[in-house]
């Protein structure tokens, strides 16, 4: 039991570091945009460079862990992530920061799938569900606590501190792994499917570029690459995505839900800080604190929902949770400009937190327990995590482009396209008040939240595919 606690501590710390970094930067983005002179496209790439590399290589990371040892690959990922975080902190331009974020993505791709696979291998079946629920609750809390931590660090120290904070976490994680976590033997032999890895990287990268830069040709390349990826996976002996896993209705339904719900969540966490800081004039710390209701509900309810899923099965929870989350997104269309936080953003953020709390732990457990062959635990974890990060990657690209399009249309003839690309940071020309800029952003934000609500409700359809507990 003591050994299991150390294993759980190491996997939670390492995963939390990567997951925090996926969201901690969101509150820093408005400050980064000004400090580095970046437009919204570059701000999207600062987020998406990390998500693109993470999404593309996570499957390879899971497969690598299955072949050379999950603990070894996990530790390598933690070390690389820490080094890349230091590089991010030293960046003095948007392109350098984008490159450093991509390096962080490589480290995260190595450590993230290994964490759940280590838990699956180290815990006996009777304690595995509780361990996965604890991991899910803590890492989900880290994801949502990211904006809170980021806001405080940006205001109290510097935007660079949101990256430097990873260094002590990485060091502690490596110490635990070195002294307390036993090594696990490889579970799979054979070469890694680098052809499939290259094609999925091309597909995701081209799709992201197509959405952010409005390039139709890139979209066509993405489609061709994805079709090629599917064809290769059907033919190679050791595919990076064993398509046989999708014969499980439960595994397929859980991943459909993941794609849609995490896409909606990523859209909200990307755009909400711009609204709070640039339109509502919250300080970075106040903007981070605005997420506290989400943090509180995740910490209080996630373990409860995981235990409830063990008793009644996950299907009902995975239908109800996304619908409640959709209500939270819909409530975030209500705020205009000004007003008390408690009557504007609080109801939506709280409702969203309740919906995600109902969903996250049962969803993670469902994915990991739907695979009968434990040899592919790393691949299953990698697939689900890849889908979650790819959902965020594509959602930020799509919803960011949608926001700019609505914003630019509302300000057509008043603001240049170059200024419109900065969204709420756009400088109003002579004769145009800042209120006009803010009104246009609020309209764009509302359209995005309605779309996110639709995605969340649609994600409940994935849960309908999941088999009922007998």
Language-model segments: which ranges?
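Intrinsic disorder in cytosolic terminal tails and internal cytosolic loops
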Residues: 1-3, 431-438, 466-470
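Transmembrane-helix bundle of Major Facilitator Superfamily
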Residues: 1-179, 304-305, 312, 333
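12-transmembrane solute porter fold
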Residues: 6-27, 40, 137, 195, ...
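A membrane-interface helix-boundary motif in multi-pass transporters
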Residues: 155-167, 213-216, 283, 404-453
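Helix-capping/helix-break motifs at membrane-protein junctions
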Residues: 124, 372-373, 416
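C-terminal membrane-cytosol helix-exit motif in multi-pass small-molecule transporters
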Residues: 168-186, 203-212, 223-236, 462-467
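Central mid-sequence intracellular linker of multi-pass
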Residues: 173-207, 245-247, 415-423
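Hydrophobic/small/kink-forming positions within alpha-helical transmembrane segments
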Residues: 55-56, 86, 144, 201, ...
């Amino acid at each position: 039991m003591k050994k299991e606690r150390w294993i759980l501590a190491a996997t939670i710390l390492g995963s939390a570091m990567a997951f925090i970094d996926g969201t901690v930067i969101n509150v820093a983005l408005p400050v980064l945009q000004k400090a580095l002179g970046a437009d919204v496209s570059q701000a999207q790439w600062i987020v998406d460079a990390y998500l693109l590399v993470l999404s593309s290589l996570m499957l390879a990371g899971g497969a690598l862990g299955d072949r050379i040892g999950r603990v070894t690959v996990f530790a390598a990922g933690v070390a690389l992530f820490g080094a890349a975080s230091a590089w991010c902190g030293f960046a003095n331009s948007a392109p350098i920061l984008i490159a450093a974020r991509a390096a962080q993505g490589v480290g995260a791709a190595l450590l993230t799938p290994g964490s759940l696979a280590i838990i699956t291998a180290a815990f006996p079946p009777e304690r595995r569900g509780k361990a996965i629920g604890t991991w899910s609750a803590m890492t989900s809390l880290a994801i949502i606590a990211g904006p809170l931590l980021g806001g405080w660090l940006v205001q109290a120290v510097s935007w660079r501190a949101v990256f430097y904070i990873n260094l002590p976490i990485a060091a502690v994680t490596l110490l635990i792994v070195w002294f307390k976590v036993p090594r696990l033997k490889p579970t799979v032999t054979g070469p890694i499917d680098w052809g499939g890895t290259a094609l999925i990287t091309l597909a995701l990268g081209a799709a992201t570029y197509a959405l952010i830069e409005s390039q139709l040709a890139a979209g066509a390349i993405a489609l061709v690459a994805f079709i090629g990826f599917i064809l290769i996976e059907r033919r190679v002996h050791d595919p990076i995505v064993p398509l046989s896993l999708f014969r499980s209705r439960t595994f397929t339904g859980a991943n459909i839900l993941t794609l849609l719900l995490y896409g909606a969540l990523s859209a909200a966490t990307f755009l909400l800080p711009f609204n709070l800081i640039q339109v509502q004039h919250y300080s970075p710390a106040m903007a981070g604190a605005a997420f506290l209701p989400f943090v509180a509900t995740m910490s209080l309810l996630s373990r409860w929902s995981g235990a409830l899923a063990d008793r009644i099965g996950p299907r009902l929870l995975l239908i109800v949770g996304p619908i409640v989350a959709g209500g939270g997104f819909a409530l975030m269309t209500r705020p205009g400009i000004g007003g008390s936080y408690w009557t504007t953003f609080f109801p939506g953020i709280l409702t969203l937190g309740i919906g995600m709390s109902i969903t996250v732990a049962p969803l993670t457990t469902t994915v990991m327990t739907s695979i009968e062959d434990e040899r592919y635990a790393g691949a299953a974890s990698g697939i689900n995590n890849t889908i979650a990060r790819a959902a965020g990657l594509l959602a930020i690209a799509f919803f960011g482009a949608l926001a700019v399009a609505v914003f630019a249309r509302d300000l057509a003839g008043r603001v240049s396209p170059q200024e419109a690309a900065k969204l709420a940071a756009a400088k109003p020309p002579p004769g145009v008040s800042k209120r006009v800029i803010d009104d246009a952003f609020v309209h764009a934000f509302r359209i995005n939240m309605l779309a996110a609500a639709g995605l969340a409700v649609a994600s409940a359809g994935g849960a309908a595919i999941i088999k009922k507990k007998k």
